[in-house]
Regions:
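PAPS-dependent sulfotransferase catalytic domain
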Residues: 87-88, 92-210
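C-terminal accessory extensions appended to soluble enzyme cores
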Residues: 211-234
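Generic N-terminal leader/processing signal
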Residues: 12, 98, 123, 224-227, ...
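PAPS-dependent sulfotransferase catalytic core
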Residues: 1-81, 216-224
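A periodicity- and composition-biased signal for non-globular, repetitive helical segments
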Residues: 20, 106, 130-131, 231-234
């Protein structure tokens, strides 16, 4: 068993959780064999632990629709053992370790039961920006279906994504109300050259700031800065 509690990174999809995870990984948190898709999640945990659970309870493995019902979440046996075994096999020795998955909040009770001392990072983004991103992203297609729109009581794809964002936000409130050790971070602030939240988050996690972080994230923020016509001064 791993004595060190994990860092669990979540947020509504299209919110920038992958960028935050990349920073935390660069600053020393072990993540195992990171996602081939550049999303800074762990593929083995996703595909062999989380996805089967979602399939078993009959919800969407992409975390779009249908979603788990919080009050009806079942706690599977051996969750902690399965997750830690992946990390150990993939080379974990000691120190901070992390797992990033936007769907963590949809099943927070499972993870909280397995890792009650985990530190949670909730990555946020403005609702309108999330919805715009969903509408532009090919695999975000749950609410192109009129059947799904009708099921959640809306009549357009945009309204469907608004409903969906609210579902995630309700889970965030539940997590905080439950007393879980959560820190909220808004990556958009970095677009304007404000890195204070990421500094504070790393300090809270007990990880050192590395100057290479700026070289990692600035190119990721470039397109957003161009659209917003933001000039930063380092």
């Amino acid at each position: 068993m791993i004595e060190q509690a994990p860092i669990l990174i979540t947020g509504i999809p299209r919110s920038g959780a992958s960028m935050i995870a990349s920073v935390i990984n660069m600053c020393g948190a072990f993540g195992g064999n990171m996602s081939k898709r550049g999303m800074f999640g762990n593929d083995k945990i996703r595909e062999e632990v989380v996805d089967p659970y979602f399939n078993n309870i009959g919800v969407d493995t992409l975390g779009q629709y249908p979603l788990p019902v919080t009050d009806d979440i079942s706690i599977p046996a051996g969750w902690r053992r399965k997750v830690e075994q992946v990390m150990l096999v993939e080379g974990y020795k000691e120190g901070q370790w992390m797992y990033k998955d936007a769907r963590l909040s949809l099943m927070w009770a499972v993870w909280h039961y397995a890792f009650p001392d985990a530190k949670w990072i909730i990555v946020r983004r403005r609702t309108g920006d999330i919805i715009s991103s969903c509408l532009r992203t090919g695999f975000m297609e749950a609410f192109t279906s009129q059947e799904n729109q009708k099921a959640v009581g809306v009549s357009t794809e945009e309204e469907g994504w608004l409903w969906w964002v609210r579902q995630y936000e309700e889970r965030f409130v539940e997590m905080i109300t439950e007393g879980m050790n959560c820190k909220v971070i808004w990556p958009e602030r970095m677009v304007y050259g404000d890195y204070q939240q990421i500094y504070e988050t790393l300090e809270w996690l007990g990880l050192p700031w590395k100057s290479e972080v700026l070289s990692l994230i600035d190119p990721l923020l470039w397109n957003v800065r161009q659209k917003k016509k933001v000039i930063t001064h380092k």
